[in-house]
Design a protein with these regions (language model features):
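Active-site-adjacent substrate/metal-binding segments within catalytic domains
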Residues: 23-98
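Active-site region of glycoside hydrolase catalytic domains
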Residues: 2-42, 85-87, 95-473
Length: 473
């Protein structure tokens, strides 16, 4: 038996959820519309109702957390459940629901880490010519919504503004498989990320000026980018350009308060290739700069990495949303082509499994952005086609995936990175935005017909790690 590795005292072992992916009740109890409602209905592939029925079943899930040693839970507030029209009239039933949820969490010792916008900006901001966060008035609306939540839900001490701004930009304007989406519009992708980062910055300043107490940060899907051939200058440049899209643009905004010259140069070049311009104003930079001292924490969602090689040609991206292994393609003009390095495994959805990439990413944040304060791994997990036999789910590949990533987190901590917690994605099986219900991530299996929960083998494994603070490598 190898020697166990010890997590620091106070390390959070959490599970992650998101409102639209777990709550169900998407058009009831006073909730307003979000773009996904009509988009998914038109596709007809799968419905977000009832998802995990968390709106009604959350006491069951919080009890499972308590029984399995999980002491933190990522949840999000559905903006349109509070403000059905984005602004104006408040839905008191939605406010009461979240108070009850947070009270249940806190009473059970399962501390809530709450995100304000997790891919479900209200539909109202896309009407009458609106384009969501591409329309600057949405920035101000978000800040007002955030201020309401800070003042109303004072029982919450851990806040995140947004979940995965790069993923939002990718789904909306690169892959184009999200509502109101367009393909290969890098100009709009960068602009969307910029506007959302300005909204984040203004909300962070409002939080600290309001003296609400606790901490606030942002969650980003950060993804290491590697040249397929590290000795090939063109491959290195392809990796650098991909890194600007996914990582540097949002990290610079968060921890520099502006965009480094080479970051801006790369973004401008890609925007021009897409036929557009960027609108980065002096007052935007002032807002980013004002938030610099107040970014208390960074949430890192991490699943995979990307290997890039230089290539010329036209855009060609195919998203694997079915689990048909080998069906994904990623070729972006001005960047290059994504590929798989020989010997590196992938999931059925073509996500590259490379846990060492998380270590590289964490050390990179520490070295390139030394003013960061703390990091939470806010999502990490493996989508898997779980088998179900007599109530037992043997998900050994998921355990191995988690074990490897946790080991690299410990190595990063040993290297001086301040990582305060880990939230497995996901707490329970959930609705997936582009995969529906066949791509399962949960520690707890859900029979979606009966809504009964079953602990998987990974839940028992994670319970042991959480309760002992020890990882057997």
């Amino acid at each position: 038996m190898t020697n166990p590795m010890q997590f620091p005292d106070g390390f959070v072992f959490g599970g992650a959820t998101a409102a639209y992916q777990v709550e169900g009740e998407t058009r009831t109890h006073g909730k307003g519309k979000v773009p996904w409602d009509d988009f998914l209905a038109a596709q007809g592939r799968f419905s977000p109702d009832p998802a995990s029925d968390f709106y009604n079943k959350y006491p069951v899930d919080i009890d499972l957390c308590q029984r399995f040693g999980i002491n933190g839970i990522r949840v999000s507030i559905a903006w349109s459940r509070i403000f059905p029209n984005g602004t104006g009239e408040i839905n008191s039933e939605g406010v009461a629901f979240y108070h009850e949820l947070f009270a249940t969490c806190n009473k059970a010792g399962v501390i809530p880490y709450v995100t304000l916008d997790h891919f479900d900006t209200p539909e109202a901001f896309y009407q009458d010519g609106g384009e969501g966060f591409l329309t600057r008035t949405t920035i101000d609306a978000f800040v007002e919504y955030a201020k309401f939540c800070f003042a109303e839900f004072t029982e919450v001490k851990h806040w995140f503004t947004f979940n995965e701004i790069p993923a939002t930009a990718e789904g909306s304007f690169i892959v184009g498989n999200w509502p109101h989406g367009e393909k290969y519009r890098l100009d709009k992708a960068f602009q969307l990320m910029h506007n959302m980062m300005v909204a984040h910055a203004k909300a962070v300043v409002a939080f600290h000026e309001g003296g609400f107490g606790g901490e606030i940060g942002i969650v980003q899907n950060l993804e290491p980018k590697y040249p397929l051939d590290p000795n090939n200058a063109a491959d290195c440049e392809a990796a650098r350009m991909a890194d600007v899209i996914n990582n540097r643009w949002v990290l610079d905004a968060t921890f520099r308060g502006h965009y480094a010259a080479d970051t801006m140069e790369a973004a401008t070049k890609l925007a021009h290739i897409a036929g557009g311009e960027l609108d980065v104003r002096d007052e935007d930079i002032a807002a980013l700069t004002a938030a610099l001292p107040y970014n208390d924490c960074l949430g890192v969602n991490t699943y995979k990495c990307q290997f890039l090689r230089a290539a010329e040609g036209e855009n060609d991206i195919n998203h694997n949303g079915t689990g048909d292994k080998g069906s994904s393609r990623w070729f972006l003009k001005g960047v290059g082509e994504a590929c798989v390095r020989e010997g590196v495994p992938t999931t059925d959805w073509d996500w590259i499994i490379y846990p060492e990439g998380l270590y590289d990413l964490l050390l990179r944040i520490k070295n390139d952005y030394p003013n960061y304060k703390k990091i939470y791994i806010t999502e990490n997990g493996m989508g898997y086609k779980d088998g179900f036999e007599d109530g037992f789910i043997d998900d050994a590949p998921r355990i191995d995936y988690m074990r490897q990533h946790l080991a690299w987190i410990l190595k990063a901590i040993d290297g001086g990175v301040n990582v305060d917690g880990y939230f497995v994605w996901s707490l329970q099986d959930q609705f997936s935005w582009t995969n529906g219900y066949n791509k399962r991530y949960g520690l707890f299996y859900i029979d979606f017909e009966t809504q009964k929960r079953y602990p998987k083998a990974s839940a028992y494994w994670y319970k042991n790690v959480a309760e002992t603070g020890l990882l057997m490598a």
